[in-house]
């Protein structure tokens, strides 16, 4: 199978043209786990709603408080240009949730990322870089999440750590912390 080409990527279009009223629900509040790995805990629920006219094509997404995410999965060598906590933070968490939950097609999850970044006024070139990165290379993360879930891993906490140095790897070994 050859390398995907630029022409094989279809950027989602917003009905009615242009940006509709913002559909991000609640700002994202996260806390970083301790340790070397970059894992974050979503402190409050967030959500995303389709723009008016797009309700038939896209479905709302609600991310529960306690969801554990790596935010934007950007390779370390791109962090100066695309930090994992950029303007697209909210969209990255929604996207991580959709990739974890897998209740909809991967293409829809990627399109929701694009639309949410558009509504959050993320610059076009940044949106393109992130969208194309996940759209062309996200299958590995999608498959890895499916395998982790099948093996019993959970990503939604009911109990949050109060120790700032506890790592995600340590915390997830405690059976009484999951929702």
Kindly give the residue locations of the regions a language model identified.
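Extended terminal accessory/targeting regions
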Residues: 1-179
